[in-house]
Amino acid sequence: MASSRREFLIVSGGTLAASALNLAHPSALRANPLGRPIGLELYTVNAELDKDYEGTLKKVAEVGYTEIEAGVSTKRAAADAKKAFDTAGLKCHSLHIGMGGIEEAIPYAKEVGAKYVISSVTFPVPPKPGPDGKIDMKALFAQLSSFTLDDYKLIAARCNDMGKKAKDAGLQFGYHNHNFEFKPQSGGAYGYDIILKNTNPSLVTFELDCGWMAAAGHDPAEYLTKYSNRYSLLHIKDFHPTDAPSTGLSPDDRPKPAELGRGHIDYKPIFAAAKKANIEYYYVEQEPPFTTTPALEAIKIDYDYLHAMV
C-alpha cells in the first residue's frame, strides 16, 4: 500500500482506478504476505464452476480474490471465459495446460489475457486416451511414480520445446511440480533437480507448488533461495501431516488436504524466501476432496489465513 500512496501524489487517474477496485473488493486494502494480490487457482472450485460458472466466479471475487489462474477449457470458449472473468472483476495472468502440447493453449492464453502458460503435469511422451476416449488414471499415476532420470531429461527437453513455442508467441512457459518428482532416484538424485538443471532459464520458468514439495519432504524455502532466479509463481496449499514423505499421486499415496493453517506447513519462511525471489504471482489451491468444508468456504478460510499472517 505504500507504493499506492506514492502513486497517489503522481498519477491521479491511476488512483481513481485503484479506488474503484478497492470499493469493489474492500479486502484488497488489507495487507498480505507478499505485498501483492492473493490469487486463486480455479481448479479448487472446479465442481462449482461446472454447476454455475459465472456465479462461482462472482463468489470467488466476493471473498476478496482479484486474480485467478485458470485452465484451458473444452467447455467454454476463451472469449466467453474472458468476458466472465471481466464481469467478476478477476484478472487471469496464468493458464494451466493439460498433459498434451502447448499449441491449443497459446491462443486461449492470449484471449483471456494470460502471460504465463504452465504445464500441470509433463510427460516424456504425452499419454494417449484408451478406446473409450478416456485416460486410465490408475495407470497414469503408476507411470508418474516410475519415471527414471532419463525420463526426466526427456521431460526437460519437452519443456524447452514448449518454452520456445510460448516465447515465440510472446508468452512465458512454466513447469508446475507435484510430489512424484521427489521420489529418490539412483545416486540420490531427484527428477525435479534434473528438470531445473536441464531447462533453459530463458525459455522455462517454474511455478513452485509449495504444498506438494513439502508433502514430499522437501523445503520450498530452500529451493526458492537456491534457485531464486528460476521461480515466477507459487501455489499455496496445505496438507495434514503424514508419517512419511508422500511421493505418489494415487489416492492411497497422497496426503489428506487441509485449509491453510489447518495442516502442517509453515509458510512464514517460505514467504520470506519468496519475497527475495521476486515472485510475481501466487495462487491459493486446495486439493479435493472437500469432505468437511465446502470449497467456497475453504477458499475464504485460506484467504483470511494469509491476511492474518502479516
Task: Tell me the role of every PLM-derived stretch.
Residues 1-16:
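N-terminal secretory signal peptides and thylakoid transit peptides that target proteins
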Residues 14, 67, 93-205, 296:
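Active-site acidic/histidine proton-transfer and metal-coordination neighborhood
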Residues 23-50, 55-59:
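C-terminal segment of N-terminal export signals and the immediately downstream linker at the start
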Residues 32-33, 57-62, 76-92, 103-114, ...:
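Acidic (Asp/Glu)-rich catalytic clusters
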Residues 36-41, 68-70, 92-95, 117-119, ...:
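Hydrophobic faces of well-ordered beta-strands that scaffold small-molecule active sites
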Residues 40, 60, 68, 85, ...:
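Conserved, mostly hydrophobic/aromatic
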Residues 46-51, 69-80, 96-104, 124-127, ...:
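Acidic-and-aromatic substrate-binding clefts and catalytic sites of carbohydrate-active enzymes
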Residues 168-264, 271:
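Acidic/histidine-rich catalytic cores of soluble enzymes
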